[in-house]
């Protein structure tokens, strides 16, 4: 299970690195679901669940200040938990969409607190005319500021298992009643 968790984290990191290879659409749920199926040994189910999640995330692109949920982690974890439990596509949706929303928060935290030092160092390199340094900061900042965060969350989420993820959802999505306040 640890090896599968690590591989799923790497799949999520590959999907998040899509712009490294141009706009390859690696991050789309159809591709992520298929790769998750490869890791878990059930490619047909991975493709089916990826297609289901593709319908849910269709049109999930940033427009203006609107940031869509982080569909890579939602697809990988939703597909992985559905394949390992033998549940239906509705499970992939009910796990994938909340996970995608939560991971978006973690991704934004990485962009606010981890990425800026790399950007400032890149500015220093640019002022010196060191383009290799700028490129290096670009890759390192993207890796540590976003990519690694998503990979670790996916790997730890899968390794912790469904009950731990469900407990987290219950903790976050249970709000007190107005009568309790």
Feature names for model-found ranges:
Residues 94-172:
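Helix-loop-helix junctions within the multi-pass membrane cores of secondary transporters/permeases
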Residues 1-73:
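Hydrophobic transmembrane alpha-helices
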Residues 7-8, 12, 16, 61, ...:
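Short helix-perturbing small/polar motifs within transmembrane alpha-helices
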Residues 15, 19, 41, 53, ...:
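Membrane-water interface at transmembrane helix exits
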């Amino acid at each position: 299970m640890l090896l599968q968790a690590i591989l799923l984290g790497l799949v999520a990191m590959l999907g998040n690195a899509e712009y490294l290879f141009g706009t390859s659409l690696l991050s789309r749920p159809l591709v992520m679901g298929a790769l998750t199926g490869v890791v878990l040994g059930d490619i047909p189910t991975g493709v089916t669940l990826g297609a289901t999640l593709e319908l849910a995330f269709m049109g999930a692109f940033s427009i203006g200040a609107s940031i869509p949920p982080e569909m890579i982690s939602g697809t990988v974890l939703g597909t992985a938990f559905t394949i390992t439990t033998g549940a239906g596509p509705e499970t992939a949706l009910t796990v994938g969409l909340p996970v995608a929303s939560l991971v978006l928060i973690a991704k934004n935290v990485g962009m606010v607190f981890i990425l800026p030092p790399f950007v400032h160092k890149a500015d220093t390199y640019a002022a010196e005319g060191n383009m290799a340094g700028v490129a290096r900061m670009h890759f390192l900042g993207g890796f540590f500021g976003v990519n690694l965060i998503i990979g670790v969350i996916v790997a730890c989420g899968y390794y912790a298992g469904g009950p731990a993820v469900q407990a987290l959802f219950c903790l976050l999505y249970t709000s007190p009643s107005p009568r309790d306040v």
